[in-house]
Amino acid sequence: MPFKPLKLSVIAMVILYAVLMIPVTSWLNLLSMLFVRNAFESSQSELTQNALWVNMIVMAVIPPICEEFTFRGLYYNGYRQRGVWCAILGSALAFGLMHMNFNQFCYAFVAGIALGILLEATGSIFATMTAHFVVNGWSTAL
């Protein structure tokens, strides 16, 4: 598993990459809601009862670490011997399915592809954790 440290310039590019992912994933979520009601929206009201810092830890810090370790670490590396695209698509598919509903699958699968490409480009799981944190943190803060 690539735990290569990141230069400050790479971190800045990763943050920009993540910010550019946000409109794409938002659009896919909206598109998916044409077919199926978003199941996650109903549970979001429960989150508003917590302090923002609690929500940030629960939604934007812990999941990126655990999910990136699992999907871009274990799954990606398991599929990598079959080729880059098998690793990217296989880990993205597992990442999408883990979200367990159609709406989240749609954007999580595409985000998983973007994160797999980011892992391949940077060679560091810290890059995918950072990008995942930015995306989750953005939606949690809003």
Regions found by a protein language model. Give the residues of each.
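Hydrophobic alpha-helical transmembrane segments of integral membrane proteins
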Residues: 12, 16-21, 93-108
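Functionally important transmembrane alpha-helices
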Residues: 92, 104-142
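Aromatic-enriched alpha-helical transmembrane segments of multi-pass intramembrane proteins
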Residues: 48, 84-86, 142
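Membrane-interface helix/loop boundary segments of multi-pass membrane proteins
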Residues: 66-90, 117-124
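Juxtamembrane helix-loop-helix connectors linking adjacent transmembrane helices
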Residues: 1-69
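Hydrophobic alpha-helical transmembrane segments
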Residues: 11-15, 53, 57, 85-90, ...
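Active-site His/Glu-centered metal-binding helix of metallohydrolases
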Residues: 65, 69-70, 74, 101, ...
